[in-house]
């Protein structure tokens, strides 16, 4: 039996098939992400859905801002490409990604290598390098 469109799961903003089985398990819940890539995907979804509370809750206290500005009116996130996820230590990881968006009719591309740390068993976003150099 094929599910009808009214009951089909919503696609996840991060590009995976179903939000409720992907980033929806972490955005707005207490369930921690099992790894840095999953956390990064949930943070992208939080940007798409304007869930700033999730962004702040998953930002490490040592670098977390006091608040996050609302997105500019008309901003549309178009897609996420995860290029690399690697552990850099027992409690550290990097995720390189490209996120595409459109604002006021212009296409934008954010290429970032984000650093994550595991603190008391939970992964947190630490910081990121925009337009990182190509690894050689």
Curated annotation (Swiss-Prot):
<dbReference type="InterPro" id="IPR032710">
    <property type="entry name" value="NTF2-like_dom_sf"/>
</dbReference>
<dbReference type="InterPro" id="IPR048469">
    <property type="entry name" value="YchJ-like_M"/>
</dbReference>
<dbReference type="InterPro" id="IPR023006">
    <property type="entry name" value="UPF0225"/>
</dbReference>
<protein>
    <recommendedName>
        <fullName>UPF0225 protein Mpe_A2093</fullName>
    </recommendedName>
</protein>
<comment type="similarity">
    <text>Belongs to the UPF0225 family.</text>
</comment>
<dbReference type="Pfam" id="PF17775">
    <property type="entry name" value="YchJ_M-like"/>
</dbReference>
């Amino acid at each position: 039996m094929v599910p009808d469109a009214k009951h089909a799961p919503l696609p996840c903003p991060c590009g995976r098939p179903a939000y409720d089985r992907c980033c929806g398990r972490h955005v707005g819940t207490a369930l921690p992400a099992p790894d840095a890539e999953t956390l990064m995907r949930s943070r992208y979804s939080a940007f798409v859905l304007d869930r700033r509370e999730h962004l702040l809750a998953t930002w490490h206290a040592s670098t977390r801002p006091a608040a996050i500005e609302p997105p500019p009116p008309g901003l549309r996130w178009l897609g996420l490409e995860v290029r690399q996820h690697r552990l850099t230590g027992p409690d550290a990881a990097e995720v390189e990604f490209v996120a595409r968006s459109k604002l006021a009719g212009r296409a934008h591309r954010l290429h970032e290598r984000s650093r994550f740390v595991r603190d008391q068993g939970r992964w947190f976003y630490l910081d990121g390098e925009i337009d990182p150099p190509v690894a050689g």
